[in-house]
Regions:
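Alpha-helical transmembrane segments of multi-pass membrane transporters/translocases
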Residues: 134-190
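Selective transmembrane-helix segments that form parts of the transport pathway or gating/packing helices
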Residues: 15-45, 61, 65, 69, ...
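Hydrophobic alpha-helical transmembrane segments
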Residues: 57-65, 90-94, 119, 150-158
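Short hydrophobic, aromatic-rich alpha-helical segments embedded in or entering the lipid bilayer
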Residues: 109-150
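Short helix-loop junctions at transmembrane helix boundaries
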Residues: 34-58, 66, 80-85, 105-111, ...
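Transmembrane helix segments
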Residues: 85-122
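Transmembrane helix boundary and interhelical loop/hinge segments in multi-pass membrane proteins
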Residues: 1-16
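Hydrophobic alpha-helical transmembrane segments of polytopic membrane proteins
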Residues: 58-85, 100-103, 158-167
Length: 190
């Protein structure tokens, strides 16, 4: 609601602090749901993990946590452009499906054509899937084998940092522009 946004922006805290608080709160909620998902996964598939190396399982969990950070950063960026709840849900579904397809979550990467693979390298899901495939193929855990996995995870963190940085810059530009405070119908003026 625009009136609520305007009321929050005139609070006696700096916009940077407000963004930090919003980001931390979003991160905490995301982490809570991530933990719940991991716990449910262990409850459902725990029996199948009996022979799995715990280091492999921990790397998979860590990779999924990094992807959570990517998803939260992307959602923060998208939320700057879309305000309505229904439209946000539609865009979230579209982005999730598009990134999942391009990143190899629906179709294995080796079945994708060269053109699609080239495009998918520009998505964080590609690097998540790539790291996951490398983690599941691990037979030893020295740096020579782990370096490609760490590289894929760092690329995901780079995407997260880029999304978050762009969101902060666009948020600042939006606050500073006069169109950010265009006449708005509130409860006071109808």
């Amino acid at each position: 609601r625009p009136d609520l946004r305007m009321r929050n922006l005139c609070a006696p805290i700096r916009p940077r602090t407000m963004n930090l608080q919003l980001s931390l709160c979003t991160g905490l909620v995301g982490a809570a749901f991530w933990c719940l998902t991991v716990i449910i996964g262990f409850l459902i598939y725990g029996g199948r993990l009996g022979g799995a190396d715990p280091r492999t399982v921990l790397l998979m969990i860590g990779n999924s946590f990094v992807y959570l950070i990517v998803a939260l950063s992307l959602s923060f960026l998208v939320s700057l452009f879309i305000r309505g709840g229904n439209v946000q849900n539609a865009v979230a579904n579209f982005l999730a499906l598009a990134l999942s397809f391009l990143g190899g979550a629906f179709v294995p990467l080796e079945l994708l054509g060269d053109g699609i693979l080239t495009v998918s390298r520009f998505t964080p899901t590609f690097w998540y899937t790539s790291a996951l495939e490398k983690i599941t193929a691990l037979t030893r855990y020295d740096w020579a084998v782990l370096a490609p996995v760490v590289g894929d995870i760092l690329v995901q963190l780079g995407f997260a940092a880029a999304f978050f940085s762009v969101a902060l810059v666009l948020g600042r530009l939006r606050r500073q522009s006069s169109s950010g405070f265009a006449p708005t119908a509130t409860e006071m003026n109808g």
